[in-house]
Amino acid sequence: MTTNLTRSEAQSRTQLLEVDSYSVHIDVSNAETDADTYLSRTVVDFSARFVDSTFIDLIADSVSSVLINGESLSPAEVFDGARVTFPVRAGRNSLTIEAQARYSTSGEGLHRFTDPADGKTYLYTQYEPTDARRVFANFDQPDLKAEFIFTVTAPAHFQVLSNRTEARTEPADGSAGAVTHYFEPTLKQSSYITCITAGPYEGATDEWTDPRTGQTVQLGAWTRASLVDHLDADDIFGVTKAGLEFFTSEFDYPYPWGKYDQIFVPEYNLGAMENPGLVTFTDNLIFRDKVTDANYESRANVILHEMAHMWFGDLVTMKWWDDLWLKESFADFMGGLALAEATRFTDGWVTFALRRKAWAYTQDLYPTTHPIVADIPDVEAAKLNFDGITYAKGASVLKQLVAFVGREAFFAGSRLYFKRFEYGNTELADFLECLAEAAPDRDIANWASAWLGTSGVSELSLQLTTSDGSAEASEGSSAVSGGSIGFANGGASASAVSAQSGGRGKLVTSSSGARLRGPDAVDDNFDAATGAAHEAGSGASGSVEPPRRRSGSEKITSATIAQADSAEGTALLRPHTIEIATLGRSGRSIVPLDSFRFEFSTESADVEQLIGRSAGVITLLNFNDLDYARVRLDPESTEAAVTSASRIKDPLSRALVWSALDNAVRDGLMPVQKYLTAYARSLGKESHAGIMAGLSQTALTCIDQWVADRNFDAAIMGLLGAALDALAAAKAGSDAQLHLANLVLALTSRTARCAAGSSAVAMGRGFASQVLAVPVGEEIDRMYAGAPGQSGQAGSAGQSAETSGGTRASRGADHSTATLPFRGLINDHALRWNALTALVSLGWADQTDIARENHSDPSSSGRLRAETASAALPLPIVKIRAWEAIREAGALSNDVLSAIIAGFIAPSAMPLIEEYVDEYFDGLLGFWMDNSIEIARRLVLGLYPRWSVDEEAVVEKTDAWLAANVDAPAALRRLVIERRDDLARAIFLKSTQSSRH
């Protein structure tokens, strides 16, 4: 069976065929039974340019009949499990295939889900890149567009939707209680964006009328019956209408697909999918529990991203997955633009600058990095290229392109592109040609070569001299505490680094063989709550001068900007259009004093516009975030940022400064403890929900991966103390209060790694106990003491008191954190599960507690949280059973598998899963070969043993596996290489830390 369609095979079919239409009948009348398969019947009419033989894609349990031009072929002879081979004649042809396709539990193909809340069954399809073949026979490649006519037979009480409106329904022949739904033909489109949903979905309808054309678009928003009370249709429709008005106006092209249904479905592998007329979303975007404004912003962004695809991707589609960026980069950029300009989220680019671009930077520093326009030889490679480069880097580079050619020229080129290639397929050259016509005064070809055809991220730095004669270099050329750290592949890319055994100042080896050293002694003796830190460098004496800060009165006497490329390891030069700003004090705030636009394409350039201006306290490159580049702050700007980032008034500038600090700590240019100190200072001061979420993500990565074991207790205790203090002082009912509560619980779950008797454990356990003592819907404003089992023994052995939430809170020894009221903090299921899972990891709650909580929350999310908590129990037998379940991944749904993996690898006080390191590497090929690519990806990534107590041994085992499996699928090797890179980075960053003294 050959499931991996190659580019060359697709090109051969394109040269041979032109597809006219598909008539597809799907019979899911048995969906609510134990049946594993359903009937799929396809009639495809097409033309062939010459006599030949070819194949159509189909992954099915069995094929019962194959007819080509009326001639019957033997299924046993022509079907191999993934392809049906047949002869074609020159001219018109008709192929009919009838098969039994399998209901999916992996989120690929036709996924079936039974809601544990009410027992109702739901179906939906998900195809990109090539899973339409799991549902019906088709030529599953983007450039063989056709008209699709769907008919679906389903139980009578099912709501059935597809890309087009329903034409009529009829009672089904031979299926009692079933109805057949006939849908209007689609417009010409690719197979991967066809869609069917069926089930007792509920929702709301609305409509939008285009003020320019008078066109009325029918709107729908749908979800499961158990979630419909939380649908928030008014908000969803509000964003939808704003987006339709924005895009139809900016693109000067009416919405082309008729209706606009949006359906939120369970166990979805993606955020959403741009099926024209029927956009599918994960129902994680339906908020049952309270969330911060960052979640509402994220949902709006996803809605607008998918809507942008109606033009970029659906109307005009890439020929092959090499040009995936022609839809994903554009949708990411356009979604962000519409978010900021057409909705209430006017600062939507803030979250993009800090969080979305961090994804791009990380991906771009892996040894597996690739150009935005990538080489995609097959569909397995395509599946993995839905990554931070194709999405976030591509979107950021498009922001740079808009800055380079101007907004009007960019949109003029886009409008020309839609009109010239509507309902067709394109490649890079087609868009560039349209853009060049719209911007004749710009060298589009050179820009595209520099930005789209190269990999890696530029690093921008600024060398300043101020009026007092001091020279200030960016971090990239200065010492962290006096000693320069160099890394291959930019900063600390561990593509790079293969940690050798040894103590502090370990030797690491780059991919080129260069030997690199980190600081011999960077002291982790710090208190994150107070911000006190002591640092020592790698100089001969280990002493350094204290960091110097600008007063704000200095004048700049010289300024030079420089660029270098991290991934290439050379001075790869790109044209940059950026803004530069100086930030200074205004009362207690830090605000822009001056800013200007600057263009350069050389390795370095003098910035004469800065001379004579105030240096302020922070000099910020890439002000307003027009560029895709990692900014290196000069040392004095860094010191100001570490102590005062929260005082920067403009949230976008604040996000950009934090982004620079994030990159510095990741690259080993800033001590981990210094970053955590800066982060601790921000707690309680930061009010932007997107920034809070981005900073906590980096801080938790520091705790999970980059803090040395010997410093772990001090680091987490400092952060927990700071977070609890900030939570106690937070405004009642605010985003900050909710974020801090979840942060405290996230940190608490990690205290399982702390030494016995650590006060950090007691601090976190006290708050978790407080959460579990309060029922859902009530305010956590009372004073409690103790935690489950705190009286001396874990779990049921503790003295307990029942609560209406279903989990007992045992009365035990008092401690300070258990007496804090958190007024305005309303308890919900999410908080309770976070608290319970933390206590489970600590051994202070057991299976009885989990069962009771699940009984009080029988929803699908409750079931998943119970699976995670159960697998997190720190008992050897639990880990054995979890591993056995994981190894039988085919019997689990995608989300249940991930939930069990999350619990299996949860922190615990004992190294309970060390024995599975070797089993992981022994099973890697089986993970990949025996499962669909989505399930395989979850296994390979989720189980990679970075949790091992012997990280260096894991790197060695990874290298041995890669050396022994050079012929393993490239997509599998890529995942393993990237996980190795993360682990090698962690080893390096830990090696730069000394023990406390």
Whereabouts are the PLM-identified features?
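Juxtacatalytic substrate-recognition/specificity segment
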Residues: 150, 179, 202-310, 314-324, ...
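Cation-handling catalytic/transport regions enriched in His/Asp/Glu
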Residues: 263-265, 269-271, 290-295, 320-324, ...
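Acidic/His-enriched low-complexity segments
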Residues: 1-258, 289, 361-362, 375, ...
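Non-catalytic accessory/interaction domains
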Residues: 154, 308, 375, 397, ...
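Surface-exposed patches in mature extracellular/periplasmic domains of secreted proteins
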Residues: 254-262, 321-322, 346-349, 413, ...
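Alpha-helical scaffold elements that line and support the substrate/ligand-binding pocket
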Residues: 306-317, 331-335, 393-414
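Acidic/His/Gly-enriched intrinsically disordered linker/tail segments
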Residues: 272, 328, 332-400, 404, ...
